[in-house]
Design a protein with these regions (language model features):
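Substrate-binding pocket helix/loop in short-chain dehydrogenase/reductase
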Residues: 73-74, 78-86, 192
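Residue(s) in the substrate-gating loop at a strand-loop-helix junction
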Residues: 118
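Short, small/polar-rich loop/turn modules that mediate ligand/substrate recognition or access, typified
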Residues: 63, 150, 155, 221-223
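C-terminal substrate-recognition "lid" of short-chain dehydrogenase/reductases
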Residues: 94, 200-228
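Active-site loop-to-helix junction immediately N-terminal to the catalytic Tyr of the SDR YXXXK motif
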Residues: 69, 77, 124-133, 144, ...
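Alpha-helical segment proximal to the catalytic Tyr-Lys
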Residues: 102, 147-151
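Active-site helix of classical SDR
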Residues: 97, 134, 142
Length: 235
């Protein structure tokens, strides 16, 4: 997005990490700002959006993309871990999208809110009940906000990828192997890629290209869930 001329705000719980990304962009002559944001903290979310408005004066596109993964067998799932998952993947999405909606509505120009769903917005997976719960809800929230936002020119979308080999997913491989009593190779082949048609991971670039495409949408796709799943979850 920055390469295409957008001013980018990098918001993360890890401020040092956000600053490193923003510096990489500004060193390349692009426009970026880093802010600390715990998406499950209402005051931090609002403060982060206020900082963005002070710096750039508008809120045109927001992608709600914070995430964490904690896996356990369902009957052993600690309630504290459930609450943490829901706080980030459901409450956090609500707080970020509401903050964006408020500012887009107030501007009179509208904007685009992009939610991060998952293939697990549509299919169930072992050991991930709270993740399934939240990601299904994210897709539903996008549809509801699309209805309410239309009159203000606010469009919403949910990008739903299958597994991407990020550090978060890399961490899951040994955890699932341990909990399921199988090898790491079996986790990749028989769980993560089993239901794709080509045995291929989705990539970060797939998501970035879809985000850029949606930044130019004029409402034809509002409310839709875009499935980047290599055929795993076909509409």
């Amino acid at each position: 997005m920055a390469k295409e001329g957008w001013a980018v705000v990098v918001a993360d719980l890890n401020l040092a990490g956000a600053e490193a990304v923003a510096k990489e962009l500004t060193d390349a002559g692009l426009t970026a700002l880093a802010v600390r944001m715990d998406v499950a903290d209402e005051q931090e979310v609002e403060a982060g959006f206020d900082r963005m408005m002070e710096q750039f004066g508008s809120c045109d596109l927001v992608m709600s993309n914070a995430g964490v993964q904690i896996v356990h067998p369902f009957d052993e799932y600690p309630f504290e871990d459930w609450k943490k998952m829901v706080a980030i993947h459901a409450d956090g999405v609500f707080l970020v999208s509401r903050a964006a909606f408020r500012r887009m509505k107030a501007s009179g120009k509208g904007g685009r809110i992009v939610f991060t769903g998952s293939v697990q917005s549509f299919v169930g997976s072992k050991l991930k009940e709270p993740y399934n719960f939240a990601k299904r809800g994210v897709a539903g929230l996008a549809k509801a906000v699309a209805r309410e936002g239309a009159e203000y020119g606010i469009y919403t979308y949910t990008i739903c990828p299958s597994f991407i080999k990020t550090p978060l997913v890399e961490k899951q491989i040994p955890e699932q192997a341990r909990d399921l009593g199988i090898s790491e190779e079996e986790v990749v082949k028989n769980i993560m890629l089993r239901d794709t048609v080509d045995g291929v991971f989705t990539t970060v670039e797939d998501v970035a290209n879809t985000l850029y495409f949606l930044s130019n949408d004029q409402g034809a796709l509002t409310g839709q869930s875009l499935r980047l799943t290599h055929g795993w979850a076909m509409a």
